[in-house]
Amino acid sequence: GEQPGDQARGARNPXGNN
């Protein structure tokens, strides 16, 4: 997502799921 490691935002915004 917007912040690395943010699973919730990372799901909709690829590149944030660390």
Swiss-Prot record:
This protein's GO CC annotations: extracellular region
Secreted listed as a keyword: yes
Record flagged with keyword Secreted: yes
Top-level taxonomic group: Eukaryota
Keyword tags: Cell wall, Secreted
Subcellular location field: Secreted, Cell wall
Chief place where the protein resides: secreted
The protein, known as: 56 kDa cell wall protein
